[in-house]
Amino acid sequence: MIKSELVQRIAEHNPHLYQRDVENIVNAILDEIVAALARGDRVELRGFGAFSVKHRPARAGRNPRTGAHVPVDQKSVPFFKTGKEMRERLNRDTGAPDSGA
């Protein structure tokens, strides 16, 4: 599902809202999550999961084509950890065994 499909589905389930208003709300939520992560904050949505930033140290990499060693700079990457309720629902709905993670 892409963002436009998400907006459309939310608008269909909430006929009292205009689709452009739903799109503005979804964009505002996503913008706030990104802004919080950029500040170094953790964003927790109970039952859904938590967004955070993980910092990867600089390391030596390898060019797969030439085999030459190349330095890889340190970087920050977004990380998402699913909430307990989401994990339970996904495992219940798919019939997959609970990994306990």
Swiss-Prot record:
Q: Name one GO cellular component term.
A: cytosol
What is the recorded name of this protein?
Integration host factor subunit beta
Quaternary state and interactors: Heterodimer of an alpha and a beta chain.
The family annotation for this protein states: Belongs to the bacterial histone-like protein family.
Metal-binding is among the record's keywords? no
| Pfam hit, one | Bac_DNA_binding
Q: Which NCBIfam families match?
A: hip, PRK00199.1
Taxonomic lineage per UniProt? Bacteria, Pseudomonadati, Pseudomonadota, Alphaproteobacteria, Hyphomicrobiales
Q: Name one GO biological process term.
A: regulation of DNA-templated transcription
Compositionally biased region (Basic and acidic residues): 82-92
Matching PANTHER family, A to Z? DNA-BINDING PROTEIN HU (PTHR33175), INTEGRATION HOST FACTOR SUBUNIT BETA (PTHR33175:SF5)
- Keyword DNA-binding listed? The answer is yes
This chain's source organism reads: Rhodopseudomonas palustris (strain BisB18)
Single GO molecular-function term? structural constituent of chromatin
Annotated spans, Disordered: 58-101
* Alphabetic keyword roster: DNA recombination, DNA-binding, Transcription, Transcription regulation, Translation regulation
Give the function comment from the record.
This protein is one of the two subunits of integration host factor, a specific DNA-binding protein that functions in genetic recombination as well as in transcriptional and translational control.
